[in-house]
């Protein structure tokens, strides 16, 4: 699309705002960031569509609606430390919002380097959240991820409190499950 600024505005107005994303900071970030820079040039025309866009084998950007809802659910604040796991667009949005972002795109994605993060997000679905992600979540920290073990996944927010970790479901989503992160099914009598 020749006029990407208009495409970004249309994306926010037709996909993000109608999906109850009310955080104006997220609207502004999505209007400012060129989403087509996060996908191969051959897929740039899909960057603002209401679909997941594959940017590398087995890796896809979430739908604009879903990434905005996920980020709104984790309530990022300027100055916080964030970890973006296979989430290049979300990482750029978090940086735009004033967070310090560590990106994890390669290696053992289930075991981030030791640290303490206020916000953790992943743009790929997982069958189950790896324990390593929860271990690096700071007290009061929020992890936003889509858990999927079937046709429809649930965007979940995990919050670390003093006495443990809580979980709540935020919305339904259907991104592909990342390679190596499918739910393990055991034997069961039917």
Feature annotation, model-predicted:
Residues 71, 75-165, 169:
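Conserved nucleotide-cofactor-binding alpha/beta core module
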């Amino acid at each position: 699309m020749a006029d990407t600024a208009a495409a970004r505005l249309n994306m926010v107005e037709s996909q993000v705002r109608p999906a109850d994303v009310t955080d104006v900071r997220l609207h502004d970030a999505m209007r400012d960031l060129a989403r087509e820079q996060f996908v191969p040039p051959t897929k740039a025309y899909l960057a603002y569509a209401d679909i997941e866009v594959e940017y590398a084998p087995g890796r896809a950007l979430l739908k604009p609606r879903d990434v905005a809802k996920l980020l709104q659910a984790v309530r990022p604040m300027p100055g916080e430390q964030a970890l973006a796991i296979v989430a290049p667009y979300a990482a750029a949005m978090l940086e735009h919002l004033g967070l310090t972002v560590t990106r994890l795109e390669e290696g053992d994605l289930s075991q981030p380097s030791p640290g303490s993060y206020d916000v953790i997000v992943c743009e790929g679905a997982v069958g189950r959240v790896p324990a390593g992600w929860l271990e690096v979540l700071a007290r009061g920290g929020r992890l936003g991820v889509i858990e999927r073990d079937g046709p429809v996944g649930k965007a979940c927010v995990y919050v670390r409190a003093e006495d443990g970790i809580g979980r709540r479901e935020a919305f339904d989503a259907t991104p592909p499950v990342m390679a190596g992160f499918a739910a393990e099914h055991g034997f069961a009598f039917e």
